[in-house]
């Protein structure tokens, strides 16, 4: 891990992870970046994780561990996205990710019980730490959300996420969460099987410690999740090929083959089913570096960072926007238009009339789904539909106060 960490390292000290030995040989492992309001996955944290956790796994005096966070509303909120924008060497990315992934695999397969006490957001690489634990206790704090949103940045979960999430919630729900970047709150996570127990924020660590002691003493066995019938049927070769074929077809219909990330997620999940978890874990690692430097990922990372930066602009200095223009009716343009229609009239430009028509149809279909889920009313659907227009003439966007280029 050393070469990759040195490439991006911002610190000379290791102070983001604190360890404390408790009774009965349980070690409290606390994530707490002193320089940030939230914990994020950085190269410095990853190297510290290796140097502090591996010795604990090898120490005979240590009987178990409880992972927690000192932050009031964050466990680990995924990666530091700014570092994604700086990454320019796919091999270094794979090296760093691979070292982290293999430590999590070793942790998950170890004989020492590891329990996660999740209070606040556990996203991306943060959730992958949680998934490597043997028992998960989550708080019902409003900020407690769990998810693998990597696809929204053009990449894939690459520290075991494509294997361990479906292992907990099943193939169908796991694929849905990863292919959409969907986040779930604690109570829904419990219903899905993503977490084992939900309690109040003030009790989450003590409950996790209690469960660690139960596991050590044999009063509680590590949860075994029997696959539902549909999952077992999907495991049959003929059914499996049909199932993953349909998943790929659905992904291609949504992305028009413009985004490689979702297909890589499907590939890794399928490989795990067909040839085992170990091969799939190595496939994850091999994909993360090349994906991170694709034009698609670069654009999505830029969009994320720009959006975050815009949130810091004082409202009084903001210019009033009455109409949004979007250049490009592809998947990205359609997505931006769908979000913008909630507040503004939108004009989408494309040289292809078919692309414009398809864009409008997909937006309408998305709005209809929102009506069915009661996210919006039928009246809101009609209002947003009327705000949408498409054109092949660039001059038709002259009245737009904001123009976004979304063409590939």
Where are these regions (language model features)?
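NAD(P)+-binding Rossmann beta1-loop-alpha1 motif at the extreme N-terminus of oxidoreductases
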Residues: 309-366, 389
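Glycine- (often His-adjacent) and acidic-residue-rich active-site loop
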Residues: 69-103, 122, 152-155
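Glycine-rich beta-to-alpha active-site loop
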Residues: 70, 101, 106-153, 157, ...
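Conserved CoA-thioester-binding segment of acyl-CoA-metabolizing enzymes
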Residues: 6-68, 103-106
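Amphipathic alpha-helical segments at domain termini/boundaries
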Residues: 9-32, 37, 131, 172, ...
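Conserved N-terminal Rossmann-fold NAD(P) cofactor-binding segment
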Residues: 352-401
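Short glycine-/small-residue-rich Rossmann-like dinucleotide-binding loops
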Residues: 119, 407-408
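Hydrophobic, secondary-structure "cap" segments at the distal end of domains
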Residues: 161-172
């Amino acid at each position: 891990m050393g070469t990759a960490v040195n490439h991006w390292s911002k610190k000379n000290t290791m102070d983001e992870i604190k360890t404390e030995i408790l009774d009965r040989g349980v070690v409290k492992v606390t994530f707490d970046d002193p320089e940030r309001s939230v914990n994020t996955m950085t190269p410095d944290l990853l190297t510290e994780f290796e140097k502090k956790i591996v010795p604990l796994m090898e120490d005979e005096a240590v009987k178990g561990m409880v992972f927690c966070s000192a932050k009031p509303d964050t466990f680990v909120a995924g990666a530091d996205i700014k570092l994604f924008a700086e990454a320019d060497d796919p091999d270094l990315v794979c090296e760093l990710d691979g070292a982290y992934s293999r430590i999590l695999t070793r942790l998950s397969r170890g004989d020492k019980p590891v329990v996660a006490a999740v209070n606040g957001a556990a996203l991306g690489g943060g959730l992958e730490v949680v998934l490597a634990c043997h028992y998960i206790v989550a708080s019902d704090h409003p900020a407690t959300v769990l998810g693998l949103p990597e696809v929204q940045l053009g990449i894939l979960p690459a520290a075991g996420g494509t294997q361990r999430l479906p292992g907990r919630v099943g193939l169908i729900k796991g694929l849905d969460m990863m292919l959409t970047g969907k986040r779930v709150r604690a109570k829904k996570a419990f219903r899905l099987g993503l977490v084992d127990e939900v309690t109040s924020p003030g009790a989450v660590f003590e409950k996790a410690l209690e469960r660690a002691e139960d596991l050590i003493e044999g009063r509680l066995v590590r949860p075994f999740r029997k696959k539902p019938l549909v999952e077992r049927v999907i495991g049959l070769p003929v059914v499996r090929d049909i199932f993953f074929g349909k998943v790929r077809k659905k992904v291609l219909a949504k992305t028009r083959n413009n985004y490689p990330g979702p297909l890589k997620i499907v590939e890794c999940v399928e490989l795990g089913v067909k040839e085992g978890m170990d091969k799939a874990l190595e496939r994850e690692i091999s994909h993360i570096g090349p994906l991170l430097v694709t034009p698609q990922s670069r654009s999505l990372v830029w969009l994320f960072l720009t959006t975050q930066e815009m949130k810091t602009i004082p409202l009084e200095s903001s210019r009033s926007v009455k109409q949004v223009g979007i250049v490009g009716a592809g998947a990205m343009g359609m997505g931006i238009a769908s979000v913008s229609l909630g507040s503004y009239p939108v004009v989408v430009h494309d040289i292809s009339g078919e692309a414009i028509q398809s864009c409008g149809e997909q937006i309408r279909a998305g709005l209809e789904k929102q009506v069915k889920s009661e996210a919006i009313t039928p009246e809101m659907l009609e209002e947003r539909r009327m705000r949408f227009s498409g054109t092949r003439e660039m001059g038709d966007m002259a009245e737009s106060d904001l123009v976004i280029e979304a063409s590939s």
